[in-house]
UniProtKB/Swiss-Prot annotation:
Secreted recorded as keyword: no
Keyword Protein biosynthesis: yes
Keywords: Cytoplasm, Protein biosynthesis
One matching Pfam family: RRF
Stored NCBIfam families: frr (TIGR00496)
Domain of life: Bacteria
The protein's role, per its UniProt record: Responsible for the release of ribosomes from messenger RNA at the termination of protein biosynthesis. May increase the efficiency of translation by recycling ribosomes from one round of translation to another.
Species in which this protein is naturally found: Nitratiruptor sp. (strain SB155-2)
GO MF term set: ribosomal large subunit binding
Subcellular locations according to the entry: Cytoplasm
Family, per entry: Belongs to the RRF family.
UniProt name for this protein: Ribosome-recycling factor
Gene Ontology cellular-component annotations: cytosol
InterPro entries (UniProt xref): Ribosome_recyc_fac (IPR002661), Ribosome_recyc_fac_dom (IPR023584), RRF_sf (IPR036191)
């Protein structure tokens, strides 16, 4: 394995950590409700736990309403029960044809709690990025130990991995800050 391959490995895996962070952010509630809040709720679909978005059409009708239209109307009760068990802070409104979820405007406390979750997701991403850095550094040190690279190349390699790490940590910080502003905006 060459140094360039190690850098590529580090970039790829750190990018995956960023992608996971963005996915995690989709589950957070902002001033506008998104379908991501309910899409991964599992519904018992003929004995198999199935994500809600695979058993029904899930649409954000407006800033505070999500409409769920199951492909199979016999699932209405099951979907309603799954939403109540998911404890997302709303009661499902079943009209016999579809389920509507009315989300009240977020309170300051709820916004602060969501912002705190955003920070926690950011910390989780930073830990993952640092773990990738550790793995990349270990690979570089092994190359030096096996005499595949010189001491100078080892030093340059470790510095380059640190630069890549700093770049991705900054991206995480920027994303967290942006998400917090989005959450706190009334």
């Amino acid at each position: 394995m060459e140094l360039n391959e190690i850098y590529e490995y580090a970039r790829d895996h750190m990018q995956k950590s960023l992608d996971v962070l963005k996915k995690d952010f989709n589950t957070l509630r902002t001033g506008r409700v998104t379908t991501a809040v309910v899409e991964n709720i599992k519904v018992d679909y003929y004995g198999a736990p199935t994500p809600l978005n695979q058993a029904a059409s899930v649409v954000a009708a407006d800033a505070t309403t999500i409409v769920i239209s199951p492909w199979d109307k016999s699932l209405l009760g099951e979907i309603e029960r799954a939403i109540q068990e998911a404890n997302i802070g709303v009661n499902p409104n079943n009209d016999g044809d579809q389920i509507k979820l009315f989300f009240p405007p977020m309170t300051v406390e709820q916004r602060e709690a969501e912002a705190k979750k955003a920070k926690q997701f950011g910390e989780k991403a930073k830990i993952a990025i640092r773990n990738v850095r550790r793995d990349a550094n270990d690979k570089i040190k092994k190359l030096f130990k096996d005499k595949a690279i010189t001491e100078d190349e080892e030093k340059r390699g470790l510095e380059e991995v640190q630069k890549i790490t700093d770049e991705f940590i900054k991206k995480v910080d920027d994303l967290v800050k942006q998400k917090e502003q989005e959450i706190m905006k009334v």
